[in-house]
Amino acid sequence: NEDGSYEFVGKDISCNLGSLNIANVMKEPEKIGSAVSMAISMLTGVVQNTYIQAVPSIAEANDTMRSVGLGQMNLHGYLASQGIEYGSEEALEFVDVYFALVRHYALQMSMEYARYSGSFEGFEESGYADGSALAEYESVPHLPKSEKVASLFKGAHIPDRDDWARLNREIQNNGLYHSYLLAVPPTGNISYVNGATPSIHPVTAAVEIRKEGKMGRVYYPAPGLNDETLPYFKDAYETGYEALIDTYAAVSYTHLTLPTTPYV
């Protein structure tokens, strides 16, 4: 309008993103729930303190949808530290259990926020309102199958059918504060700063060579690289696109995108 106001304000993306370092989280499996809850609380703080007035559509989406994207990094680094080959059956089993755990605790935290602060706009029309979004977890809980993966989660409370059913009922009764909770951001440079492998992606080289501005050539060895872990740090080309796609397919619990590069 001529006065600078808007007849209609749509909803655009507000990227409130953060990532957990899988290797750090798995040092204390019994505290996975606490780590996820704290991460969601931190991202919620970003949502609540963000107001981009210059772009009304972003401000509108942030206020009404409260989208956050909790991601993960250092999957390849953690698997190598445990003697597990990226894309193997054990690796895919770990990914399945880990990301189901993250989803459970993220949803639980969002439900607690909604209990006191209300649900995101459109919750009543979502699959969470009628329980269909979580129905599969009540029939097929994502639990460890092998002794190897079960040992990695020793001490952690892994939700069973009853836990998922209880959470499903609580969400239907109380709602969800966030419209979106989980993502898998690419975390390129962020991973290097954290001493981690990028996102849930395989490394492009056991020792990566990068050019960093005025620093020139910089060498980044994979985290924890030594004689024992070297065989598990096959680069993305040697690992192959099939293992990469299988890994991303196992992460079926995210609410946002799964960006990846299929190296062929």
Locations of the language-model features?
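Function-dense linear segments that define catalytic or interfacial modules
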Residues: N1-N62, Q72-Q82, A196-T197, V203-A222
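Generic alpha-helical structural element
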Residues: Y6, V25-E28, I32, T64, ...
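Alpha-helix initiation and N-capping motif
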Residues: G10, S14, S19, P29, ...
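Generic alpha-helical scaffold signal
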Residues: K11, G33, S37, G69, ...
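Structural beta-strand/beta-sheet cores of well-ordered domains, especially the beta-sheet scaffolds
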Residues: K11-G18, R66-G77, Q82, M109, ...
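Internal maturation/activation junctions in enzymes
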Residues: A35-A59, S67, I84-T187
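Catalytic alpha/beta core of large soluble enzyme barrels
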Residues: L43, V47-N49, S119, F153-D162, ...
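Compositionally biased non-globular segments, especially hydrophobic aliphatic-rich helices
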Residues: E136-E138, T260-V264
